[in-house]
A protein has these predicted regions:
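The feature represents the first ordered module of a protein
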Residues: 50-103
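Short Fe-S-cluster ligation motifs
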Residues: 146-163
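N-terminal leader/targeting peptides and immediately adjacent processing regions
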Residues: 6-14, 19-63
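Short, hydrophobic/amphipathic alpha-helical patches that form generic packing surfaces
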Residues: 3, 81-89, 125-129, 153
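Immediate flanking context of iron-sulfur cluster ligation sites
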Residues: 99-119
Length: 163
C-alpha cells in the first residue's frame, strides 16, 4: 500500500543515466497529455481528401446506388453514429488481432466500410501511413473523431457529388 501511495504521489520521475536524464514515463505523459486536452494537429478535410484522391488505389472506391440510397434513408447523423462505433471497435484498439484484414472491401455490407478504404481508415497500418497516427497505441478520442470526420466527409461528398 505504501508503494502504491508513493507511486501515485509522483508527479515526475527521472533517472540519471550516464549524465543524460531519461524520462521513465515519456509514453505515459504523452498519452496523459492527449487525454487532458493537448490536441494533435490534424490535416484539414479538404487537404486530406485531395491527398487521398491522388492515390490510384484510394480513388477507385465509390458508393454504389444502393449504398447512396441507404445513406439518404438513414441520414448522415445515423451514418456518423455507425462510423463512430465501427472506428471505436475496429480501428481504435492498440492491438487488433487481424489488422489489415478487419474491414470488408466488398459492396453491400455498409457504406462506412467502403469509406474506410477510401480514406485510409481501414486498418492501423494504413491509418499510420496516411495520417501519421502510430499503431500500437489506443487511439485518443480526438484521433477517433478525426477518423469519423474523414469517413463521413467522404460519404457526404459521394452522395452530394454523385446523387
Amino acid at each position: 500500500m505504501a508503494e502504491l501511495l508513493f507511486l501515485s504521489s509522483i508527479t515526475h520521475m527521472k533517472e540519471n543515466s550516464g549524465g543524460n536524464e531519461v524520462d521513465l514515463f515519456a509514453s505515459f505523459w504523452k498519452v496523459e497529455a492527449e487525454e487532458n486536452g493537448a490536441e494533435r494537429e490534424f490535416e484539414s478535410m479538404d487537404k486530406a481528401m485531395e491527398r487521398l484522391g491522388m492515390s490510384r488505389f484510394r480513388s477507385r472506391f465509390s458508393l454504389n446506388e444502393k449504398e447512396k440510397e441507404y445513406v439518404r434513408t438513414k441520414g448522415m447523423a445515423v451514418i456518423k453514429q455507425h462510423a463512430a462505433e465501427i472506428v471505436r471497435k475496429r480501428l481504435a484498439p492498440a492491438e487488433i488481432r487481424n489488422d489489415g484484414k478487419q474491414t470488408p472491401m466488398r459492396h453491400g455490407l455498409h457504406p462506412v466500410f467502403i469509406a474506410q478504404h477510401a480514406t485510409a481508415c481501414c486498418c492501423r497500418g494504413c491509418f499510420e501511413k496516411w495520417h501519421g497516427i502510430p499503431k500500437g497505441v489506443r487511439l485518443s478520442q480526438s484521433e477517433q473523431d478525426y477518423a469519423v470526420s474523414l469517413i463521413t466527409e467522404w460519404i457526404r461528398r459521394q452522395t452530394e457529388e454523385n446523387p
